[in-house]
Design a protein with these regions (language model features):
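Noncatalytic, basic helical substrate-engagement surface that gates or grips nucleic-acid strands
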Residues: 2-141, 153-169, 249-250, 256-262, ...
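Conserved RecA-like ASCE P-loop NTPase motor core of nucleic-acid helicases/translocases
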Residues: 142-148
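Acidic, divalent-metal-coordinating active-site segment for phosphoryl/phosphodiester hydrolysis
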Residues: 149-150, 209
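Conserved, surface-exposed functional patches that form binding/active-site neighborhoods
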Residues: 157, 176, 204
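A short, charged helix-loop
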Residues: 167-197
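Accessory alpha-helical DNA-binding modules that contact the DNA backbone or grooves
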Residues: 185, 193-264
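Conserved cytosolic headpiece of P-type ATPases
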Residues: 268, 274-275
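Long, highly charged low-complexity segments enriched in Glu/Asp and Lys/Arg with interspersed Ser/Thr
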Residues: 277-283
Length: 283
C-alpha cells in the first residue's frame, strides 16, 4: 500500500488501530540530526494512520527492560557500552532529543491520541498485550509502526508491520518475501541466531541460512531442545550442543513477546487493556 505523507489530519474512528513504536520512530529524526521534530512526528503518525485506514492511534514509550534483565542481567548490557565514550556535546544533544520526544508524546496526548508508557516496561511488550487481545478489544486490523523486526513475532492475518526505515510492509500475505520459513518458526529462528542489538547470544556459526535449514530438519525450538545433543561432525552443530537446551530456553523467555505478557509488562496488562478499550469506545 502506498504511503502518502501529504494526507495528514486526524483519522476517522473505524476499529482499525495504529500502534507506533514511539522512540523507534523518533530516531528517524535523530539520525538526520534534527532535534526539532515534534510537528513532523505528529504529521507522520497521522499520515500513516490515514494511509493504513486506522481510525485509532496508540503511541508507545519505552520505560526500561526490568522483566528481561531479571531473566538475563546481560540483556541490553551493550547499550551502556555503546554510549560510554560520548562527548559532552553528544550527551547534551541526546538529552535534547529525549526531551523533544517527551514534548512530542505530550502533544500527541493533547490531540486526543492514546500514549502508554510504564517504568521498567518495553514498548514491544505493551504492543504484545494489545495485539494478542485484538478481538477482545473489538479491533479489526492492527498496523505496527516500527523498524524493529522483533515485532514480526506479533504478525498474523489481522496484524501487520510497516518500517519507516526500509519503507516496507511485512504482512502474513507477503511473509515469504522476507523469510524462508513459516511465521510460527520465527521465534526459533531468533533463538538460534540471537540478537546483537539486544545482547542476546545466538549459536556460533549459525546464521540465517543454517537456522532455516535446522528448522526444516528438526522443527521448532522446543523440538530442537528435545533432540539435543545431536551427533554431528559439523562444528556449528557441536556449537549448538554446547549452547544447550537451557540457553535456548532462556532465549525463548527473552525473545517471545507472547510468552508471559503480563509478567513482561510488570502486571500492567489489565490496565493497558482498560486504557485501549476506553480510548476505542470513546472514539
Amino acid at each position: 500500500m502506498a504511503i502518502s505523507f501529504m494526507n495528514h489530519g486526524k483519522p476517522t474512528p473505524n476499529g482499525n488501530l495504529l500502534i507506533v513504536d514511539g522512540l523507534n520512530l523518533a530516531f528517524r529524526w535523530k539520525h538526520q540530526n534534527k532535534l526539532d521534530f515534534e510537528h513532523d512526528y505528529v504529521r507522520t503518525v497521522e499520515s500513516l494512520a490515514k494511509s493504513y485506514n486506522c481510525g485509532e492511534i496508540v503511541v508507545l514509550g519505552d520505560g526500561g527492560s526490568d522483566y528481561r534483565k531479571t531473566i538475563d542481567p546481560d540483556y541490553k548490557a551493550n547499550r551502556a557500552e555503546r554510549y560510554k565514550d560520548q562527548t559532552p556535546e553528544e550527551e547534551a544533544e541526546f538529552l535534547e532529543f529525549l526531551q523533544e520526544f517527551g514534548v512530542t508524546m505530550k502533544n500527541l496526548k493533547s490531540k486526543g491520541y492514546l500514549t502508554i508508557k510504564y517504568k521498567g516496561v518495553e514498548a514491544d511488550d505493551i504492543a504484545a498485550v494489545i495485539a494478542t487481545n485484538r478481538e477482545e478489544l473489538g479491533l479489526e486490523d492492527i498496523w505496527l509502526i516500527s523498524s524493529d523486526k522483533d515485532w514480526d513475532l506479533l504478525i498474523n492475518e489481522n496484524v501487520s508491520r510497516f518500517s519507516t526505515v526500509t519503507r516496507k510492509e511485512t504482512t502474513l500475505d507477503n511473509w515469504d518475501e522476507h523469510y524462508d520459513f513459516d511465521p510460527e518458526y520465527y521465534l526459533t529462528f531468533k533463538c538460534l541466531t540471537g540478537d546483537k542489538g539486544d545482547n542476546v547470544p545466538g549459536v556460533t556459526g549459525i546464521g540465517p541460512k543454517r537456522a532455516t535449514q535446522l528448522i526444516g530438519q528438526y522443527g521448532d525450538v522446543f523440538d530442537i531442545m528435545n533432540t539435543l545433543p545431536i551427533e554431528s561432525r559439523y562444528k556449528f552443530m557441536q556449537n549448538l550442543n554446547e549452547f544447550g537446551s537451557d540457553r535456548l530456553a532462556t532465549n525463548v523467555e527473552l525473545m517471545d513477546l507472547t510468552y508471559d505478557v503480563d509478567a513482561a509488562v510488570l502486571g500492567h496488562s489489565q490496565d493497558i487493556l482498560r486504557l485501549v478499550e476506553n480510548y476505542v469506545s470513546k472514539n
